[in-house]
């Protein structure tokens, strides 16, 4: 196989490569074996036409497309490897010549990884907004959240106030006509929770059990149901019960109810302080590391980032997001209807982060190369075992899912990140 590369522009070029007859002939045989089972010709049972007869009647050229599909991937990858190119997007393949008994010649328009000119990435000083300090107010707020989780709803006769829960039947209409989804029975609604559209809950403040309240609201312009968006609506709500939230006393008994490992409220607060300190310490470290990596990327120069790299990352990110939605039972159509957005909107939402991730990965890869990082067999084995433990998977299953090249890449990337973050300091 002969190969050549012609540079057309920054990070773009054309590979010309050939496929020899010793690769083409087996591919033609495979192509014939694949299609012959469906061949039905006079004088032969279906699927039993000999190859010479096929070539005579139809010409082997009929097999070229299928044979090319068979032989092309390895031929293209071989050309890229021989030329030592770092290709980052799907190529555009064109056939130059496919003559009988001769080598085939093809071209591939490719996009290559851009050059990264590194700036400072060690001993960086960065702004960190996160704080390690834990205040008494933060500890008290955590206790209060747990206290509220143990609150009970108690029926009251007085008028509803914000924070109370009302049990209501309601019927909604637009221009006197009821609409789908506008009716509910025995619905528990916490006033001030924002469960309903703006203005609804506020109009139930002051209501008592047995009251019927007319609620007038306007649906938001971006409401998910397009036929209701921006329209004025009237709801008739019948209040069955008003319930107040009754929280337990803030004392040692409450502390024991919250956490059976403590005996007093002071012990609970001390435990929460330690937990918050550990959490804020981790958040601070993450913020410091993130800021250092961001500065290292800002200090570097990426020579003409190919748009294809960002496009591919956007596509990957959107697919991952939609897969997570579907695992929650939300189809793409349902998501777009609920959010009032489109596929194009979703791609735009992911563009900025995708651009940032691509640039970050390029810079970290460049640092790993500059530092000469490699991954030893022992490090690869440790990475496999760590992943198996993290995801509760058999070691051999992890080994089968991840190639050695993928593992090596992850290891050297971690080493490069460590170079940036280990020497970084906060201002």
From Swiss-Prot:
Cell location: Cytoplasm
Keywords in alphabetical order: Cell cycle, Cell division, Chaperone, Cytoplasm, Isomerase, Rotamase
Keyword Transmembrane in annotation: no
Function, as annotated: Involved in protein export. Acts as a chaperone by maintaining the newly synthesized protein in an open conformation. Functions as a peptidyl-prolyl cis-trans isomerase.
GO terms, molecular function: peptidyl-prolyl cis-trans isomerase activity; protein folding chaperone; ribosome binding
GO BP, sorted A to Z: 'de novo' cotranslational protein folding; cell division; chaperone-mediated protein folding; protein transport; protein unfolding
Phylogenetic lineage: Bacteria, Bacillati, Bacillota, Bacilli, Lactobacillales
PANTHER family recorded: TRIGGER FACTOR CHAPERONE AND PEPTIDYL-PROLYL CIS/TRANS ISOMERASE, TRIGGER FACTOR-LIKE PROTEIN TIG, CHLOROPLASTIC
Name of this chain's protein: Trigger factor
The keyword Chaperone is annotated on this UniProt entry: yes
Any one of the GO CC terms: cytoplasm
Family classification: Belongs to the FKBP-type PPIase family. Tig subfamily.
Gene name as annotated: tig
Alphabetical list of Pfam families matching this protein: FKBP_C, Trigger_C, Trigger_N
Reactions it catalyzes: [protein]-peptidylproline (omega=180) = [protein]-peptidylproline (omega=0)
EC number: 5.2.1.8
Domain comment as written in the entry: Consists of 3 domains; the N-terminus binds the ribosome, the middle domain has PPIase activity, while the C-terminus has intrinsic chaperone activity on its own.
Domain PPIase FKBP-type residues, every copy: 163-248
Gene3D superfamilies: 3.10.50.40, Trigger factor ribosome-binding domain, Trigger factor, C-terminal domain
């Amino acid at each position: 196989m002969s190969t050549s590369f012609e540079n057309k522009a920054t990070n773009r070029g054309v590979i010309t490569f050939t496929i020899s007859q010793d690769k083409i002939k087996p591919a033609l045989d495979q192509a014939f074996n694949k299609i012959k089972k469906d061949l039905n010709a006079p004088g032969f049972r279906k699927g039993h036409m000999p190859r010479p007869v096929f070539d005579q009647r139809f010409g082997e050229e009929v097999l070229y497309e299928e044979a090319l599909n068979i032989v092309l991937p390895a031929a293209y990858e071989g050309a890229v490897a021989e030329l030592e190119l770092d290709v980052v997007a799907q190529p555009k393949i064109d056939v130059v010549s496919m003559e009988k008994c001769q080598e085939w010649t093809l071209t591939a328009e490719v996009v290559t990884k851009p050059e990264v000119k590194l700036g400072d990435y060690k001993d960086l000083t960065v702004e960190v907004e996160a704080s390690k300090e834990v205040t008494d107010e933060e500890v008290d707020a955590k206790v209060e959240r747990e206290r509220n989780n143990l609150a009970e709803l108690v029926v009251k006769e007085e008028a509803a106030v914000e924070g109370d829960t009302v049990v209501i039947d309601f019927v909604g209409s637009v221009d006197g006509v009821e609409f789908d989804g506008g009716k509910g029975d025995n619905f528990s609604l916490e006033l001030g929770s924002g469960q309903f559209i703006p203005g609804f809950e506020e109009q139930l403040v002051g209501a008592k059990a047995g009251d019927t309240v007319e609620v007038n609201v306007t649906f938001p312009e971006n409401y998910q149901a397009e036929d209701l968006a921006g329209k004025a609506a009237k709801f008739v709500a019948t209040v069955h019960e008003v319930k107040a939230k009754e929280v337990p006393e803030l004392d040692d008994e409450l502390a024991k109810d919250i956490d059976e490992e403590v005996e007093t409220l002071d012990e609970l607060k001390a435990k929460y302080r330690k937990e918050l300190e550990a959490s804020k310490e981790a958040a601070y470290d993450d913020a410091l590391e993130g800021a250092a990596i961001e500065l290292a990327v800002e200090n570097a120069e990426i020579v003409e980032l190919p748009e294809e790299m960002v496009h591919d990352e956007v596509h990957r990110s959107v697919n991952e997001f939609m897969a997570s939605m579907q695992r929650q039972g939300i189809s793409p159509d349902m998501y777009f209807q609920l959010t009032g957005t489109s596929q194009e909107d979703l791609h735009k939402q992911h563009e900025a982060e995708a651009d940032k991730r691509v640039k970050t990965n390029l810079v970290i890869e460049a640092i790993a190369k500059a530092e000469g990082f490699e991954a030893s067999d022992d490090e690869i084995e440790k990475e496999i075992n760590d992943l198996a433990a993290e995801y509760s998977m058999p070691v051999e299953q992890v080994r089968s899912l991840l190639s050695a090249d993928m593992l090596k890449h992850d290891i050297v990337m971690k080493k490069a990140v460590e170079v940036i973050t280990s020497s970084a300091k906060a201002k």
